[in-house]
């Protein structure tokens, strides 16, 4: 593990991925805790809808970063909330250009689009990018992402 940690110290973004049940969350939490123990400022972010990161860390987490100690913070992103926020922003942009009588129909289309293939993934990708920018500005040296399961 020490060689792995040494090789990761210069990598600000770490994504832990794979199929469900293979230990992604445990591995992401372990990496984050070890890097923090080495004095690195770390944020571990779960994009997994199962929200098990809080269980592994034995902490109650939400969509806002919570400091667990001086060097370690954690949060769990809610995919449904990310989709809602993403589509609300799209609606606001469209509403600025559309005629008022078109808005009810546009809202119907946007609501239907929320369940389209890739909508959740696109919203999560945008949220991840936003967190990368914001958290780097706040001085985090590493962002460790515990990703949603693949292979489904």
Regions found by a protein language model. Give the residues of each.
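Flexible phosphate-sensing "switch/lid" loops adjacent to ATP/NTP-binding sites
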Residues: 1-15, 22, 27-152
């Amino acid at each position: 593990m020490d060689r792995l940690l040494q090789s990761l110290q210069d990598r600000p973004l770490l994504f832990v991925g794979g199929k469900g049940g293979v230990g992604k969350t445990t591995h992401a939490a372990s990496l984050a805790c070890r890097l923090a123990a080495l004095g690195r400022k770390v944020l571990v972010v779960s994009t997994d809808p199962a929200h098990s990161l809080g269980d592994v860390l034995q902490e109650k987490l939400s969509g806002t970063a919570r400091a667990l100690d001086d060097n370690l913070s954690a949060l769990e992103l809610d995919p449904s909330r990310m989709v809602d926020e993403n589509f609300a922003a799209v609606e606001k942009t469209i509403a600025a250009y559309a005629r008022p009588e078109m808005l009810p129909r546009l809202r119907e289309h946007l609501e239907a689009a929320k369940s389209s293939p890739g909508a959740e993934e696109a919203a999560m990708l945008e949220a991840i990018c936003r967190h990368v920018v914001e958290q780097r500005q706040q001085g985090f040296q590493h962002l460790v992402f515990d990703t949603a399961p693949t292979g489904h």
